[in-house]
Amino acid sequence: MALDGIRMPDGCYADGTWELSVHVTDLNRDVTLRVTGEVHIGGVMLKLVEKLDVKKDWSDHALWWEKKRTWLLKTHWTLDKYGIQADAKLQFTPQHKLLRLQLPNMKYVKVKVNFSDRVFKAVSDICKTFNIRHPEELSLLKKPRDPTKKKKKKLDDQSEDEALELEGPLITPGSGSIYSSPGLYSKTMTPTYDAHDGSPLSPTSAWFGDSALSEGNPGILAVSQPITSPEILAKMFKPQALLDKAKINQGWLDSSRSLMEQDVKENEALLLRFKYYSFFDLNPKYDAIRINQLYEQAKWAILLEEIECTEEEMMMFAALQYHINKLSIMTSENHLNNSDKEVDEVDAALSDLEITLEGGKTSTILGDITSIPELADYIKVFKPKKLTLKGYKQYWCTFKDTSISCYKSKEESSGTPAHQMNLRGCEVTPDVNISGQKFNIKLLIPVAEGMNEIWLRCDNEKQYAHWMAACRLASKGKTMADSSYNLEVQNILSFLKMQHLNPDPQLIPEQITTDITPECLVSPRYLKKYKNKQITARILEAHQNVAQMSLIEAKMRFIQAWQSLPEFGITHFIARFQGGKKEELIGIAYNRLIRMDASTGDAIKTWRFSNMKQWNVNWEIKMVTVEFADEVRLSFICTEVDCKVVHEFIGGYIFLSTRAKDQNESLDEEMFYKLTSGWV
């Protein structure tokens, strides 16, 4: 008997080899290999394939160590280096697996994704295949459970999802000649879409090659999908309170780890969403799918009451939805007969329209670049205090740089102001009612002990637009000399104009009232408040303000109006602050952190990222600490979510703030990981 066949008490053989168990998932077979600790991973896979003796392309397969939840991707590493011994159970499994992906439009597609890639890379590949630029703005999250419903059987969930399945599966290829979306920006990019209606300028096969996507009609991702049944909306989970909104954010996946490492199973349903509310370089010539999916995410956020809006704003959103639904049907029909379209001058101008919170357009009227514009007018000012019944008091107010000075009269404006406030770092919230002619601006100005609340009341839309634009810029430390000021004023005026009621409702043709389904256009709150006939009439009145818009312009205006809502762009988390006894909310926006009251959502204190020195996480006690200038230190523990999610949001927004239009290279993945992972 040969010595090498004798097995020792520790499981090793006399010749130093031992048995390694590998489960081959494709064949559902367990294979035992004789190895030593010095064998490298590549050698293990070679031995395994030779022993299987099955003619098959194994190039996409890799070894997965279930117990340690890790991929063994470093093929030059030995078993010893990985710490693998005879008790290890490995899997030999494909890296690319199917996912059921719910897009922002709530439709599901079947996608093949690399389960061994970090989620950030996997999302980039998904977006590249779907022709969505700037994938760094999106990520994946697990589906939130509706706490008000009892646990359902999986079959019930699946039947609900199948009602939202897109026609024809979209299978993302693992490789191949797919359309390669440019990196951050390219001046030599060729327009891919009609800037009028967002349709492809060339057949879909030209921009998706021979991939399986072209069979599944990827162009459908650029087309708005109307809600066909009120029952679909009724079944959706609607957060009832701010705490419910915060709990949704528990589901965000870790961008620095792979899907398998986060216990995502093959064929599992995940949500693809715009995670960061900082949309860079939205351009109709290249971004029809991106714009449509962004519009869809905004639409559902409003319908499911994830974000608050006034009654007038809701009717405006409903009118835009109705208009977009009508034009989407017309566009689909037109393109069956005619795929060639000319882009006229209006469309060419529209194609350069960008919607970002920062503005970004250079004004054609530069004026005197050495002088900073000022505002001066009579404004009503109110400082709410406890146990006071005093209302608004009129002052002559001047707005210079980032400060407002209040004088008792215009004649006294050369002297010392009665009040003065610097708006740098403040919170600016609109309080507007068009029909009631109410144009208020709520300011929360940071002071040492918290926030001072000040209200400004304007007399009309024009005055409000100029002062609101100046307040928004001042809160970011910018003055009215900034190139985005005039654009901000125009955006506010157009937003208000869309909410105007039509003075002559008789102009609305009666026959078009039949194709409106109010239950699919407004949130449940207003369905309870008004009869369907009343809502239909108001939607049609509001529609006359947007009826002349092209399809892409209507979607862009919808996104812009969504961005104008007070709650836009704030991601909530439940937190307990150091020294605090009760649970509060921490809100993270693209440029600041906000400590919030959990019941009302009111801002208690705001800290700007521009004033931040550093942030870190104590992984043992799960505490996030952020240090700001002036020795300010903020520490909190997240109670319902892994602190890694909050850490990634802060680092992610810092990463997005480094983007610039003159960059012409692909994303700096390593920089993203350094800012967000916490351990790279």
Curated annotation (Swiss-Prot):
Region (Interaction with membranes containing phosphatidylinositol phosphate): 40-81
Region entry Disordered, spans: 141-165
Effect of K383A: Reduces phosphatidylinositol phosphate binding. Reduces integrin activation
CC per GO annotation: adherens junction; cell cortex; cell junction; cell surface; cytoplasm; cytoplasmic side of plasma membrane; cytosol; focal adhesion
Record-annotated membrane-spanning stretches: none
Task performed by this protein: Scaffolding protein that enhances integrin activation mediated by TLN1 and/or TLN2, but activates integrins only weakly by itself. Binds to membranes enriched in phosphoinositides. Enhances integrin-mediated cell adhesion onto the extracellular matrix and cell spreading; this requires both its ability to interact with integrins and with phospholipid membranes. Required for the assembly of focal adhesions. Participates in the connection between extracellular matrix adhesion sites and the actin cytoskeleton and also in the orchestration of actin assembly and cell shape modulation.
Protein name: Fermitin family homolog 2
Organism the protein comes from: Homo sapiens
Gene: FERMT2
